[in-house]
Curated annotation (Swiss-Prot):
This is Endoplasmic reticulum-Golgi intermediate compartment protein 2. May form a heteromeric complex composed of ERGIC1, ERGIC2 and ERGIC3. Interacts with ERGIC3, the interaction is required for the stable expression of both proteins. May interact with EEF1A1. It is a multi-pass membrane protein. Residues 1-33, 341-377 are cytoplasmic. Belongs to the ERGIC family. Possible role in transport between endoplasmic reticulum and Golgi. GO terms for biological process: endoplasmic reticulum to Golgi vesicle-mediated transport; retrograde vesicle-mediated transport, Golgi to endoplasmic reticulum. It comes from Mus musculus. GO terms for cellular component: endoplasmic reticulum membrane; endoplasmic reticulum-Golgi intermediate compartment; endoplasmic reticulum-Golgi intermediate compartment membrane; Golgi apparatus; nucleolus; retrograde transporter complex, Golgi to ER.
Length: 377
């Protein structure tokens, strides 16, 4: 009884077979079929390789939301070289919310040479070239995000020539922590001194002819310092043509959470608008000579996440490629073979001959049958 049930079950399963096997003796091969098969297999191989390269690649997904974090501090990373002696200039941040000077203890003043060495100049040209390409090809920013922490350092390389030359500039570098509100980071003549109504700079002790706010921004970023990330002002160099010259940078900072397969960091992107003018009170151009970076924070936060195609999606796409090519090439081969048979095979010379009367021994004739080779019925 069990054997009978097993046979019935096996017979039922065989009837449900959606892939019946055709014996080889009933299969007819042809040169056209072999050619189409070679084309199909080649196409499948090429598309499979291309699909695998897509599977290996990653892309950046951007999501936007309102920034709800107002209690934390904003970090400003600075590395600027000014073409003046260190005891002539002072740098600080004016917080517009509290109208007070933020602590500048994190900044270091280091005597330096303003002119770059040949190796440093080559580094600067390369950085400026990357900046120009980023202006044209915005998708390169995704490549920079994915290569963070594994690419070469973007810091200015040390000098390789004689370092015994007398320093003629001041390198101001370090970081500051400020409130997450609009502010003004500036470098001007004289050291900053706080007082109840704000702050002031001791500029009276500096000779006016010593003013030279030519500067080079080797690095300026907001948030966590992420090696390998190139910021909009990195590599910028400005040469002052007058002692009373003001350089202004209007910066909009966008909080950014970066999540890749290499790092996870809270950083900030920013856009900048530059302006420079000569201070001339007689002509109505008022102001203070110096370098002013006025920044404001966006209310939106951007989350940048590196994503990868899941394996199940890759498998489904691969099956679609293989099955689609098999079905399409088989259908095209069948249509082509059918057309060729209609045009050529139905009208081959010698396959059929005109119908003629065929006499038989009993005296009747047959006018409907073709005449075969031996004139036999």
């Amino acid at each position: 009884m069990r054997r009978l049930n097993r046979r019935k079950t096996l017979s039922l399963v065989k009837e449900l077979d959606a892939f019946p096997k055709v014996p080889d003796s009933y299969v007819e091969t042809s040169a056209s079929g072999g050619t189409v098969s070679l084309i199909a297999f080649t196409t499948m191989a090429l598309l499979t390789i291309m699909e695998f390269s897509v599977y290996q690649d990653t892309w950046m997904k951007y999501e936007y939301e309102v920034d709800k974090d107002f209690s934390s501090k904003l970090r400003i990373n600075i590395d600027i070289t000014v073409a003046m002696k260190c005891h002539y200039v002072g740098a600080d941040v004016l917080d517009l919310a509290e109208t007070m000077v933020a602590s500048a203890d994190g900044l270091a003043y280091e005597p330096a040479l303003f002119d770059l060495s040949p190796q440093q100049r080559e580094w600067q040209r390369m950085l400026q070239l990357i900046q120009s390409r980023l202006q044209e090809e915005h998708s390169l920013q995704d490549v920079i995000f994915k290569s963070a922490f594994k690419s070469a350092s973007t810091a200015l390389p040390p000098r390789e020539d004689d370092s015994s030359l007398t320093p003629d500039a001041c390198r101001i570098h370090g970081h500051l922590y400020v409130n997450k509100v609009a502010g003004n980071f500036h470098i001007t003549v004289g050291k900053a001194i706080p007082h109840p109504r704000g702050h002031a700079h001791l500029a009276a002790l500096v000779n006016h002819d010593s003013y030279n706010f030519s500067h080079r921004i080797d690095h300026l970023s907001f948030g966590e310092l992420v090696p390998g990330i190139i910021n909009p002002l990195d590599g910028t160099e400005k040469i002052a043509v007058d002692h009373n010259q003001m350089f202004q940078y209007f910066i909009t900072v966008v909080p950014t959470k970066l999540h890749t397969y290499k790092i996870s960091a809270d950083t900030h992107q920013f856009s900048v608008t530059e302006r420079e003018r000569i201070i001339n009170h007689a002509a109505g151009s008022h102001g203070v000579s110096g370098i002013f970076m006025k920044y404001d924070l966006s209310s939106l936060m951007v989350t940048v996440t590196e994503e990868h195609m899941p394996f199940w999606q890759f498998f489904v796409r691969l099956c679609g490629i293989i099955g689609g090519i098999f079905s399409t090439t088989g259908m095209l081969h069948g249509i082509g073979k059918f057309i060729v048979e209609i045009i050529c095979c139905r009208f081959r010379l010698g396959s059929y001959k005109p119908v003629r009367s065929v006499p038989f021994a009993d005296g009747h004739t047959d006018n409907h049958l073709p005449l075969l080779e031996n004139n036999t019925h």
